[in-house]
Protein backbone atom coordinates (compact mmCIF):
# COMPACT_ATOMS: atom_id res chain seq x y z
CA UNK A 1 0.00 0.00 0.00
CA UNK A 2 1.34 3.43 -0.92
CA UNK A 3 1.78 6.29 1.53
CA UNK A 4 -0.91 8.25 -0.34
CA UNK A 5 -3.41 5.41 0.07
CA UNK A 6 -2.58 5.07 3.76
CA UNK A 7 -3.03 8.84 4.17
CA UNK A 8 -6.32 8.77 2.28
CA UNK A 9 -7.52 5.84 4.37
CA UNK A 10 -6.56 7.63 7.59
CA UNK A 11 -8.47 10.74 6.52
CA UNK A 12 -11.53 8.64 5.69
CA UNK A 13 -11.35 6.93 9.08
CA UNK A 14 -10.97 10.27 10.86
CA UNK A 15 -13.95 11.66 8.98
CA UNK A 16 -16.02 8.63 9.92
CA UNK A 17 -15.10 8.97 13.59
CA UNK A 18 -15.79 12.73 13.60
CA UNK A 19 -19.01 12.52 11.61
CA UNK A 20 -21.44 11.66 14.43
CA UNK A 21 -20.47 14.73 16.46
CA UNK A 22 -20.65 16.99 13.41
CA UNK A 23 -23.91 15.59 12.07
CA UNK A 24 -25.73 15.17 15.38
CA UNK A 25 -28.65 17.44 16.14
CA UNK A 26 -28.35 20.09 18.88
CA UNK A 27 -29.08 18.66 22.32
CA UNK A 28 -32.15 20.16 23.98
CA UNK A 29 -31.21 20.66 27.65
CA UNK A 30 -34.00 21.29 30.13
CA UNK A 31 -34.66 21.41 33.85
CA UNK A 32 -37.37 22.11 36.37
CA UNK A 33 -38.34 25.62 37.35
CA UNK A 34 -36.85 25.69 40.86
CA UNK A 35 -33.46 26.98 42.06
CA UNK A 36 -31.69 23.62 41.97
CA UNK A 37 -33.25 22.89 38.59
CA UNK A 38 -31.64 26.07 37.25
CA UNK A 39 -28.29 25.12 38.79
CA UNK A 40 -28.18 21.52 37.54
CA UNK A 41 -29.64 22.38 34.13
CA UNK A 42 -26.92 24.98 33.60
CA UNK A 43 -24.24 22.55 34.77
CA UNK A 44 -25.34 19.96 32.19
CA UNK A 45 -25.63 22.62 29.48
CA UNK A 46 -22.16 24.04 30.12
CA UNK A 47 -20.45 20.65 30.36
CA UNK A 48 -21.89 19.64 26.99
CA UNK A 49 -20.98 22.97 25.39
CA UNK A 50 -17.42 22.71 26.73
CA UNK A 51 -17.06 19.52 24.67
CA UNK A 52 -18.27 21.21 21.50
CA UNK A 53 -21.85 19.95 21.63
CA UNK A 54 -24.42 22.35 20.19
CA UNK A 55 -27.30 22.86 22.60
CA UNK A 56 -30.77 24.36 22.86
CA UNK A 57 -31.33 25.99 26.25
CA UNK A 58 -34.64 24.95 27.83
CA UNK A 59 -33.48 25.28 31.42
CA UNK A 60 -36.28 26.00 33.94
CA UNK A 61 -38.89 24.74 31.50
CA UNK A 62 -41.54 23.98 34.12
CA UNK A 63 -42.72 21.74 36.94
CA UNK A 64 -42.05 18.00 37.16
CA UNK A 65 -45.07 16.92 35.02
CA UNK A 66 -44.19 19.49 32.33
CA UNK A 67 -40.53 18.51 32.08
CA UNK A 68 -41.26 14.80 32.28
CA UNK A 69 -43.82 15.12 29.49
CA UNK A 70 -41.31 17.03 27.39
CA UNK A 71 -38.60 14.37 27.56
CA UNK A 72 -40.95 11.44 26.96
CA UNK A 73 -42.34 13.22 23.88
CA UNK A 74 -38.89 14.14 22.53
CA UNK A 75 -39.22 17.89 23.14
CA UNK A 76 -36.27 17.58 25.55
CA UNK A 77 -33.16 15.41 25.22
CA UNK A 78 -31.64 15.61 28.70
CA UNK A 79 -32.57 17.06 32.09
CA UNK A 80 -31.83 16.46 35.79
CA UNK A 81 -34.38 14.30 37.60
CA UNK A 82 -34.61 12.75 41.07
CA UNK A 83 -34.54 9.00 41.67
CA UNK A 84 -37.42 9.06 44.16
CA UNK A 85 -39.77 10.47 41.53
CA UNK A 86 -39.73 7.01 39.96
CA UNK A 87 -42.25 5.99 42.62
CA UNK A 88 -44.59 8.67 41.26
CA UNK A 89 -43.84 8.10 37.55
CA UNK A 90 -44.47 4.36 37.75
CA UNK A 91 -47.26 4.49 40.38
CA UNK A 92 -45.25 2.30 42.73
CA UNK A 93 -45.06 4.33 45.95
CA UNK A 94 -45.26 1.29 48.24
CA UNK A 95 -41.97 -0.31 47.14
CA UNK A 96 -39.33 0.18 49.90
CA UNK A 97 -36.64 0.34 47.18
CA UNK A 98 -37.36 4.06 46.78
CA UNK A 99 -36.09 4.70 50.31
CA UNK A 100 -32.67 3.21 49.51
CA UNK A 101 -30.35 5.33 47.36
CA UNK A 102 -28.81 2.51 45.29
CA UNK A 103 -31.93 0.35 45.03
CA UNK A 104 -34.06 3.32 43.99
CA UNK A 105 -31.56 4.35 41.33
CA UNK A 106 -31.31 0.82 39.90
CA UNK A 107 -35.10 0.47 39.81
CA UNK A 108 -35.88 3.76 38.07
CA UNK A 109 -32.99 3.19 35.66
CA UNK A 110 -34.39 -0.21 34.66
CA UNK A 111 -38.03 0.90 34.39
CA UNK A 112 -37.29 4.05 32.38
CA UNK A 113 -35.00 2.20 29.98
CA UNK A 114 -37.58 -0.52 29.36
CA UNK A 115 -40.68 1.64 29.11
CA UNK A 116 -39.45 5.00 27.82
CA UNK A 117 -35.98 4.48 26.31
CA UNK A 118 -34.60 6.95 28.83
CA UNK A 119 -31.15 6.43 30.36
CA UNK A 120 -30.28 7.48 33.91
CA UNK A 121 -26.65 8.52 34.29
CA UNK A 122 -24.55 8.71 37.48
CA UNK A 123 -26.54 10.31 40.33
CA UNK A 124 -25.22 12.82 42.84
CA UNK A 125 -24.57 11.53 46.40
CA UNK A 126 -27.25 13.83 47.80
CA UNK A 127 -30.85 13.55 48.93
CA UNK A 128 -33.06 16.41 47.82
CA UNK A 129 -36.10 15.05 49.58
CA UNK A 130 -39.16 17.13 50.37
CA UNK A 131 -39.22 18.58 53.87
CA UNK A 132 -41.23 21.08 55.88
CA UNK A 133 -39.44 23.99 57.54
CA UNK A 134 -40.83 26.33 60.20
CA UNK A 135 -39.75 29.70 61.49
CA UNK A 136 -37.09 29.21 64.18
CA UNK A 137 -39.01 31.36 66.68
CA UNK A 138 -42.10 29.14 66.27
CA UNK A 139 -39.99 25.97 66.50
CA UNK A 140 -38.21 27.12 69.66
CA UNK A 141 -41.32 28.35 71.44
CA UNK A 142 -43.30 25.16 70.70
CA UNK A 143 -40.47 22.60 70.82
CA UNK A 144 -40.82 21.60 67.16
CA UNK A 145 -37.92 19.53 65.82
CA UNK A 146 -39.75 16.79 63.90
CA UNK A 147 -42.92 16.20 61.92
CA UNK A 148 -44.17 14.15 64.87
CA UNK A 149 -43.86 17.33 66.97
CA UNK A 150 -45.78 19.20 64.26
CA UNK A 151 -48.60 16.65 64.45
CA UNK A 152 -48.81 17.18 68.21
CA UNK A 153 -48.68 20.98 67.83
CA UNK A 154 -51.53 20.98 65.29
CA UNK A 155 -53.70 18.74 67.49
CA UNK A 156 -53.23 21.31 70.26
CA UNK A 157 -54.62 23.98 67.92
CA UNK A 158 -51.29 25.65 67.18
CA UNK A 159 -51.18 28.49 64.65
CA UNK A 160 -49.80 27.16 61.38
CA UNK A 161 -49.80 28.22 57.74
CA UNK A 162 -47.70 26.50 55.08
CA UNK A 163 -46.40 28.01 51.83
CA UNK A 164 -46.03 25.29 49.21
CA UNK A 165 -46.39 24.47 45.53
CA UNK A 166 -49.61 22.96 44.21
CA UNK A 167 -47.58 19.86 43.32
CA UNK A 168 -46.45 19.39 46.95
CA UNK A 169 -49.98 19.94 48.26
CA UNK A 170 -51.62 17.55 45.80
CA UNK A 171 -49.14 14.73 45.15
CA UNK A 172 -49.94 11.59 47.13
CA UNK A 173 -46.28 11.07 48.05
CA UNK A 174 -45.78 14.65 49.30
CA UNK A 175 -47.91 16.56 51.85
CA UNK A 176 -50.69 13.90 51.94
CA UNK A 177 -48.05 11.28 52.85
CA UNK A 178 -46.79 13.45 55.72
CA UNK A 179 -50.36 14.07 56.90
CA UNK A 180 -51.16 10.36 56.91
CA UNK A 181 -47.95 9.30 58.68
CA UNK A 182 -48.05 11.99 61.36
CA UNK A 183 -51.83 12.12 61.81
CA UNK A 184 -52.67 15.69 60.89
CA UNK A 185 -54.70 17.40 58.17
CA UNK A 186 -54.18 20.97 56.98
CA UNK A 187 -57.26 22.96 56.00
CA UNK A 188 -57.35 25.27 52.98
CA UNK A 189 -56.87 28.34 55.19
CA UNK A 190 -53.67 26.76 56.54
CA UNK A 191 -52.19 26.59 53.04
CA UNK A 192 -50.73 29.20 50.71
CA UNK A 193 -50.40 27.58 47.29
CA UNK A 194 -47.75 29.23 45.12
CA UNK A 195 -47.24 28.75 41.38
CA UNK A 196 -44.29 26.63 40.28
CA UNK A 197 -42.07 24.59 42.54
CA UNK A 198 -39.39 27.07 43.53
CA UNK A 199 -38.60 26.63 47.22
CA UNK A 200 -36.72 29.94 47.22
CA UNK A 201 -40.19 31.52 46.99
CA UNK A 202 -41.86 29.33 49.63
CA UNK A 203 -38.95 29.75 52.07
CA UNK A 204 -38.98 33.54 51.68
CA UNK A 205 -42.73 33.58 52.29
CA UNK A 206 -42.17 31.87 55.66
CA UNK A 207 -39.19 34.07 56.54
CA UNK A 208 -41.16 37.23 55.73
CA UNK A 209 -44.45 35.91 57.19
CA UNK A 210 -46.27 36.61 53.92
CA UNK A 211 -50.05 36.28 54.41
CA UNK A 212 -49.47 34.86 57.88
CA UNK A 213 -47.20 32.05 56.67
CA UNK A 214 -44.89 30.55 59.32
CA UNK A 215 -43.83 27.33 57.56
CA UNK A 216 -42.77 26.26 54.08
CA UNK A 217 -42.17 23.39 51.73
CA UNK A 218 -38.41 22.96 51.25
CA UNK A 219 -35.88 20.50 49.88
CA UNK A 220 -33.08 18.66 51.66
CA UNK A 221 -30.43 20.46 49.62
CA UNK A 222 -31.88 23.96 50.00
CA UNK A 223 -29.18 26.39 51.08
CA UNK A 224 -31.07 29.37 52.55
CA UNK A 225 -33.05 27.59 55.30
CA UNK A 226 -30.84 28.41 58.30
CA UNK A 227 -29.72 31.73 56.81
CA UNK A 228 -33.33 32.93 56.73
CA UNK A 229 -34.11 31.91 60.31
CA UNK A 230 -35.95 28.67 59.55
CA UNK A 231 -35.61 25.15 60.94
CA UNK A 232 -36.08 21.86 59.09
CA UNK A 233 -38.43 19.36 60.74
CA UNK A 234 -36.99 15.84 60.68
CA UNK A 235 -38.93 12.90 59.23
CA UNK A 236 -38.38 10.14 61.86
CA UNK A 237 -40.73 7.70 60.10
CA UNK A 238 -38.84 8.00 56.81
CA UNK A 239 -41.96 8.91 54.85
CA UNK A 240 -40.10 10.35 51.88
CA UNK A 241 -38.15 8.42 49.24
CA UNK A 242 -34.50 9.22 48.51
CA UNK A 243 -34.34 11.95 45.87
CA UNK A 244 -30.85 11.77 44.36
CA UNK A 245 -30.42 14.07 41.34
CA UNK A 246 -29.14 12.50 38.12
CA UNK A 247 -29.02 13.42 34.43
CA UNK A 248 -31.68 11.60 32.40
CA UNK A 249 -31.09 11.40 28.65
CA UNK A 250 -32.97 9.95 25.72
CA UNK A 251 -31.35 6.71 24.55
CA UNK A 252 -31.18 7.90 20.94
CA UNK A 253 -29.30 11.05 21.98
CA UNK A 254 -26.85 9.10 24.13
CA UNK A 255 -26.07 6.93 21.09
CA UNK A 256 -25.22 10.11 19.16
CA UNK A 257 -23.04 11.37 22.03
CA UNK A 258 -21.82 8.27 23.91
CA UNK A 259 -19.15 10.34 25.71
CA UNK A 260 -21.88 12.27 27.51
CA UNK A 261 -22.01 9.78 30.40
CA UNK A 262 -18.25 10.03 30.89
CA UNK A 263 -18.31 13.85 30.83
CA UNK A 264 -21.08 14.17 33.41
CA UNK A 265 -20.06 11.34 35.77
CA UNK A 266 -17.37 13.15 37.81
CA UNK A 267 -19.41 16.34 37.90
CA UNK A 268 -22.50 14.77 39.46
CA UNK A 269 -20.37 12.54 41.71
CA UNK A 270 -18.97 15.74 43.25
CA UNK A 271 -22.38 17.19 44.15
CA UNK A 272 -22.94 16.01 47.72
CA UNK A 273 -25.57 17.62 49.95
CA UNK A 274 -23.21 20.20 51.47
CA UNK A 275 -21.97 21.28 48.03
CA UNK A 276 -25.51 21.59 46.64
CA UNK A 277 -26.64 23.57 49.69
CA UNK A 278 -23.76 26.01 49.19
CA UNK A 279 -24.40 26.39 45.46
CA UNK A 280 -28.15 26.76 45.96
CA UNK A 281 -27.56 29.40 48.64
CA UNK A 282 -25.40 31.39 46.22
CA UNK A 283 -28.46 31.66 43.98
CA UNK A 284 -31.30 31.95 46.50
CA UNK A 285 -29.61 34.01 49.24
CA UNK A 286 -26.84 35.95 47.49
CA UNK A 287 -28.93 36.52 44.37
CA UNK A 288 -26.29 35.26 41.93
CA UNK A 289 -27.37 34.03 38.50
CA UNK A 290 -27.58 30.22 38.26
CA UNK A 291 -25.61 30.30 35.01
CA UNK A 292 -22.71 32.08 36.74
CA UNK A 293 -22.81 29.83 39.82
CA UNK A 294 -22.65 26.75 37.57
CA UNK A 295 -19.81 28.23 35.49
CA UNK A 296 -17.75 29.22 38.54
CA UNK A 297 -18.12 25.75 40.08
CA UNK A 298 -17.15 23.93 36.87
CA UNK A 299 -14.13 26.19 36.37
CA UNK A 300 -13.03 25.83 39.99
CA UNK A 301 -13.11 22.03 39.63
CA UNK A 302 -11.29 22.14 36.30
CA UNK A 303 -14.06 20.63 34.18
CA UNK A 304 -14.55 23.76 32.10
CA UNK A 305 -11.88 26.25 31.07
What kind of feature is each model-predicted range?
Residues 19-23:
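Sec/Tat signal peptide C-region and signal peptidase I cleavage site
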Residues 9-18:
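Bacterial N-terminal signal peptides
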